[in-house]
C-alpha cells in the first residue's frame, strides 16, 4: 500500500511501509530539458521487490518538481525535503538510493544528518560534483557493464562512476563498486500504458541493492579511522 504526500519543497513522496524505524529514500534520474518530475520505474521495481522483506523500513520514492540535471539544486532541495519528512516521522537512519542523475542528487545531499549511506545505481557523478558530504558515510555504486554514453546524457558510464567512486574513496569514504555483467542503464523502464518493463538483468540490480539494504539495517556506517 503506497501513500503519496506533498513535500515542503512542492515535490511529492510515495511512501511504502510507513512509520518504519529506518528509511530508504529513492531519487530519480532526469533529462536535459526541464520537464515535470515522474515516478522512477527503477525505484518502483526495487520498492516492489524489497519492501515486503523489510517491513520495518519506510520506502520513500521522490518525484521531483522538475527533473533536469540543469537544475540540480532544485532536485537536491526535493531530496532534502524527503529526508526531512522521514526524519520528522521518526526514522532513526536513512539510506539514500539514487538512480542515474539521482546519484548526483544523493551525493549532493549526503551531509544531511539523517543519512547513513548512499547507494548509486548507474549513477551520474560528474567531476565537478563535490563528494565531501560522504565523509563519515558509506557509498556503494552499482553499474551495468553495458551502460554507455547516450545522446543528451552527460557522462553516465561505468568509467565515470568509477572515477567518482575513487574520488570519494580518496577522502576515506568506505564502500564498494559493483559491475553487473551485461547490465544496462537501470532495472526497468515504463511502458506507455504505465506498467513496468523490467530490463535484462533486473534481478541482479535487486539483489545487489538488497545486500546494501541488509548492511544498512544491520547497523550504522563505522566512523572513519583517524588519519
Spans of features found by a protein language model:
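Active-site-adjacent alpha-helix of alpha/beta-hydrolase-fold enzymes
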Residues: 38-49, 146-175
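Conserved alpha/beta-hydrolase
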Residues: 47-68
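Short beta-strand/loop motif that positions the catalytic acidic residue
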Residues: 135, 140-147
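Short, surface-exposed "cap/lid" segments of acyl-processing enzymes
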Residues: 2-54
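Gly/Ala-rich beta-loop-alpha elbow adjacent to hydrolase catalytic centers
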Residues: 97-106
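C-terminal catalytic histidine-bearing segment of alpha/beta-hydrolase fold enzymes
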Residues: 171-227
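Alpha/beta-hydrolase active-site loop
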Residues: 69-89
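A conserved short beta-strand
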Residues: 114-125
Amino acid at each position: 500500500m503506497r501513500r503519496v504526500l506533498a513535500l515542503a519543497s512542492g515535490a511529492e513522496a510515495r511512501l511504502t511501509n510507513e512509520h518504519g524505524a529506518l528509511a530508504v529514500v529513492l531519487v530519480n534520474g532526469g533529462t536535459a530539458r526541464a520537464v515535470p518530475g515522474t515516478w522512477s520505474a527503477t525505484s518502483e521495481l526495487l520498492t516492489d521487490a524489497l519492501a515486503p522483506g523489510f517491513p520495518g523500513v519506510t520506502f520513500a520514492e521522490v518525484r521531483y518538481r522538475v527533473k533536469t540535471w540543469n537544475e540540480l539544486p532544485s532536485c537536491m532541495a526535493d531530496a532534502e525535503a524527503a529526508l526531512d519528512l522521514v526524519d520528522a516521522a521518526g526514522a532513526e537512519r536513512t539510506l539514500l538510493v539514487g538512480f542515474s542523475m539521482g546519484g548526483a542528487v544523493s551525493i549532493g545531499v549526503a551531509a544531511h544528518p539523517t543519512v547513513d549511506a548512499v547507494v548509486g545505481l548507474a549513477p551520474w557523478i560528474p567531476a565537478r560534483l563535490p563528494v565531501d558530504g560522504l565523509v563519515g558515510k558509506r557509498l556503494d555504486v552499482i553499474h551495468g557493464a553495458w551502460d554507455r554514453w547516450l545522446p543528451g546524457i552527460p557522462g553516465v558510464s561505468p568509467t565515470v562512476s568509477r572515477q567518482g567512486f575513487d574520488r570519494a574513496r580518496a577522502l576515506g569514504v568506505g564502500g564498494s563498486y559493483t559491475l553487473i555483467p551485461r547490465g544496462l542503464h537501470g532495472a526497468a523502464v515504463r511502458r506507455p500504458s504505465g506498467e513496468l518493463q523490467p530490463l535484462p538483468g533486473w534481478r541482479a540490480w535487486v539483489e545487489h541493492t538488497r545486500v546494501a539494504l541488509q548492511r544498512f539495517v544491520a547497523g550504522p556506517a563505522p566512523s572513519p579511522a583517524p588519519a
